[in-house]
């Protein structure tokens, strides 16, 4: 199982058999991989400003142990609340990263399956992404809240809307424990973010080791 990874903008998740810019599944099958919009398009790496949204700061969201329980959604209005709490403002080109305490919970309680769920972004966050011009989105979990609250036919609403509809790449399963500790000490939730995926021709994604530089 791949831990921290970056999805390719095309081919990774599709909606009704089509990816970004309407690319049909048949094109991918014929190419034996992702012919365009693959992970190799980001071979020179990603360097941009990051905003770390600490969901445990939201009133009523976190447990006493310091994490957000699986299945808890973080909505668009929650991000707007966190902007005020953290004294930040998301701007075009930013990557937004959501801390739910997933790895802290795992360290204390052990692993759990997808059937238990994960905290993450609700589908209405897509409006926030579009309005703010966000370039990348990520989380310490699979990014989408699970269960999503949407019909099963939709699957992963944030993945489908961000990747297939808007061309916004997604970082999944990142470990923010050290970053969030530093952010709390400094009371600063923005930093320089750097990540370089592997050069995988036709690849639909890549493992990576991103860096937060305060």
Model features per residue range: what roles?
Residues 1-214:
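Active-/binding-site microenvironments in catalytic and ligand-binding cores
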